[in-house]
């Protein structure tokens, strides 16, 4: 999945390939927490990963209710948010360049829709997106998005 991530985002000016240490860190820190229903993976006929998407239930309300603390009883709010939540966060999508603009995104969204319908999710929030990443902007154009978070990179030659 991480190699596909590198391949997908390598043309963005601010992207830096993920190191093996970072890969190990992310696996240890996050993979145990993610509900497998919220991860969509698509493989080709030879079982090579060609696309993936990662979403998760939103924990914003759980954080608010627990005032940002897990102990002594904040964990209850997180468990409830994991089980019953009408909001989700869209964290990451990666599609191999050879499969972009070939309908793979439609397959991913169909599978995400099935998961959201089963779990009762009605609202989706995305992470901030780079203004220069036109592919991600085009991805949301049919959904009447409200863009209230974006990332911009400034550089200066010294």
Residue ranges: model-predicted function:
Residues 1-94:
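A conserved beta-strand-loop-helix scaffold within acyl/acetyltransferase catalytic domains
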Residues 73, 87-95, 100-116, 142:
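Conserved acetyl-CoA-binding loop-helix of GNAT-fold acetyltransferases
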Residues 79-81, 141-146:
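Short proline/glycine-enriched turn/loop segments at secondary-structure junctions
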Residues 87-88, 116-130:
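Conserved GNAT acetyl-CoA-binding A-motif
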Residues 95-100, 126-136:
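Conserved beta-strand-loop-alpha-helix junction that forms the acyl-donor binding cleft
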Residues 118, 134, 158:
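Acyl-donor (CoA/ACP) binding surface of acyl/acetyltransferases
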Residues 127, 144-158:
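Conserved catalytic-core motifs of GNAT/GCN5-like acyltransferases
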């Amino acid at each position: 999945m991480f190699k596909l991530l590198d391949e997908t985002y390598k043309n963005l000016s601010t992207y830096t390939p993920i190191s093996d240490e970072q890969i190990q860190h992310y696996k240890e820190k996050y993979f145990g927490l993610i509900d497998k229903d919220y991860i969509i993976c698509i493989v080709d006929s030879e079982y090579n990963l060609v696309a993936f998407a990662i979403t998760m239930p939103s924990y914003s309300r759980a954080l608010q209710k627990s005032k940002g603390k897990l102990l002594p009883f904040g964990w209850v709010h997180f468990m409830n948010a994991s089980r019953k939540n009408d909001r989700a966060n869209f964290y990451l999508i990666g599609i191999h360049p050879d499969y972009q603009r070939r309908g793979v995104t439609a397959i991913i969204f169909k599978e995400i829709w099935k998961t959201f319908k089963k779990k009762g999710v009605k609202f989706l929030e995305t992470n901030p997106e780079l203004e220069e990443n036109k592919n991600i902007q085009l991805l949301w154009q049919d959904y009447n998005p409200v863009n209230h978070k974006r990332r911009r990179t400034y550089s200066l030659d010294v």
